[in-house]
């Protein structure tokens, strides 16, 4: 092929008026039409492997077919994709890409990146290409234009290592509170996409099964309400859950008749609107019967209250995020290690609930706006046998305004530095009739060599220098 490409490019250069600048390739999923000039630049001048290039584009479309539940199987006409191809053509000098009935059109500046295989080039064209293919694959009875077609684009983007385009920050902002702050029709495209995508996160075959139901049953809704009801009905069937509560959380209203029909499915209290793409391929056990060792500290300013969360590092890969409850009502959800309440008052009580990626929850921690803070220099200290140890050297105490009240900390310690072993130091701080407790582990080892063999791990301290022991072999 390269020999023919070089010869044709030479002919094109010598006689451009009578030679068509045309290049095509055909795979089992794509009929691609572009220019000889771009093909020459990519395959000859830049040395991109032709087979890798064509396979790359073909695999994007094949993955879209797979995501839709399509397969080459003539015995299953509703889901058969035998001999079905996507036509992609160079069609316009401006814009980026578009979808029409029988083809996806791209522009000239877009073309070379389509043929390249490096990650940067792929990232520059992948979303737009699969977005347009999604328009072609969208089923009218189920399509929300510029939203549902992005199910294919988002899937492709994530699978290729690019970002998830769902705007979870605003989904949490609008939906986490007891009463949703915004409904589906008021959301932007990428927030609306979340309503569909989070069901895919709940069950990774959701979209394929949903598409199959639409192809098989061929519904024809008479109005927008029927369209919404059909989506809720089919989605509930696929997940085997009465999803009334989920769609209503999104402000995606269902008819009374639809709600009644959905009562035949099992109910659920899972907060699916907390899911994000970090749960994909998660196989952990979550937080059932697990001590997350969640610690919450509170700091207060004149205008807000900031909650800072810390969890057992051994289960951080299981963590989805934290639900924030204020005075008995949910006010937010965050995947960050802190949350700021900008509508705080002096008498508020907070609860923080850790959520695992399978939506199981750990023990909640309660804290009030008057709770003092205990700041440990580190969670674990290692000492040599016989070494001096003062438990108060590793802790400080503060009011919720940040005033130092370390002198009020009470220490309960069973540490015996004359005997090897693992010990616990418990710190208790009471201020304004509110008590806070924290613990630190102390390990006493036998000699210098044993201690020097300990491997350092990344450690965070609020103050001071983390240490195994300040007196042994220069370790500080």
Feature map (PLM): residue ranges:
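Beta-strand-rich modules
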Residues: 341-359
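Serine/threonine-rich, repeat-prone extracellular segments and beta-strand-based repeat modules
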Residues: 401-442
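Extracellular carbohydrate-recognition regions
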Residues: 446-473
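Solvent-exposed, low-complexity, repeat-rich "mucin-like" stalks and linkers
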Residues: 372-403
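Catalytic cores of extracellular degradative/oxidative enzymes
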Residues: 8-216, 221, 231-232
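Pan-zinc metallopeptidase signature
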Residues: 202-291
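Pro/Thr/Ser/Gly-rich low-complexity, intrinsically disordered linker/stalk tracts
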Residues: 283-318, 359-371, 395
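C-terminal edge beta-strand
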Residues: 365, 369-372, 436-446
């Amino acid at each position: 092929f390269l020999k023919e490409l070089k010869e044709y490019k030479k002919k094109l250069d010598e006689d451009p008026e009578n030679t068509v600048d045309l290049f095509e390739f055909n795979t089992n999923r794509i009929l691609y039409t572009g220019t000889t000039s771009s093909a020459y630049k990519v395959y000859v001048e830049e040395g991109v492997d032709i087979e890798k290039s064509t396979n790359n584009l073909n695999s994007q479309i094949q993955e879209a077919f797979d995501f839709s539940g399509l397969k080459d199987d003539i015995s299953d006409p509703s889901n058969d994709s035998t001999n079905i191809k996507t036509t992609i053509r160079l069609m316009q000098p401006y814009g980026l890409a578009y979808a029409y009935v029988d083809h996806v059109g791209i522009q000239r500046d877009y073309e070379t990146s389509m043929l390249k295989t490096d990650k940067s080039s792929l990232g520059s064209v992948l979303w737009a290409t699969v977005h347009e293919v999604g328009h072609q694959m969208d089923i009218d009875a189920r399509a929300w234009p510029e939203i549902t077609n992005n199910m294919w684009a988002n899937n492709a983007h994530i699978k290729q290592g690019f970002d998830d385009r769902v705007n979870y920050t605003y989904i949490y902002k609008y939906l986490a509170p007891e009463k949703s702050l915004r409904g589906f029709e008021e959301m932007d495209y990428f927030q609306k996409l979340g309503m569909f995508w989070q069901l895919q996160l709940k069950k990774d075959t959701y979209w394929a099964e949903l598409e199959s139901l639409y192809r098989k049953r061929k519904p024809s809704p008479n109005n927008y309400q029927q369209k919404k009801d059909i989506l809720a009905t089919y989605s509930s069937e696929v997940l085997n859950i009465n999803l009334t509560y989920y769609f209503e959380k999104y402000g995606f209203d269902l008819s009374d008749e639809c709600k009644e029909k959905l009562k035949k499915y099992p109910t659920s209290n899972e907060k699916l609107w907390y899911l994000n793409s970090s749960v994909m391929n998660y196989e952990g056990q979550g937080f059932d019967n697990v001590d997350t060792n969640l610690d919450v500290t509170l700091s207060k300013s004149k205008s807000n209250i900031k909650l800072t969360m810390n969890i057992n590092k051994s289960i951080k890969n299981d963590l989805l995020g934290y639900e924030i409850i204020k005075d008995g009502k949910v006010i937010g959800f965050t995947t960050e290690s802190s949350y700021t309440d900008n509508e705080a008052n002096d008498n508020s009580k907070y609860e923080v609930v850790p959520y695992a990626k399978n939506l199981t929850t750990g023990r909640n921690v309660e804290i009030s706006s008057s709770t003092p803070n205990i700041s440990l220099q580190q969670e674990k200290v290692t000492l040599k046998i016989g070494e001096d140890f003062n438990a108060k050297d590793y802790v400080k105490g503060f009011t919720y305004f940040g005033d130092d009240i370390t002198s009020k900390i009470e220490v309960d310690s069973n540490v015996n530095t004359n005997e090897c072993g693992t010990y616990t130091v418990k710190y208790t701080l009471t201020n304004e009739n509110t008590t806070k407790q924290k613990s630190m582990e102390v390990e006493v080892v036998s000699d210098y060599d044993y201690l020097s063999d300990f491997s350092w791990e990344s450690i965070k301290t609020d103050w001071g220098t983390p240490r195994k022991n300040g007196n042994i072999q220069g370790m500080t």
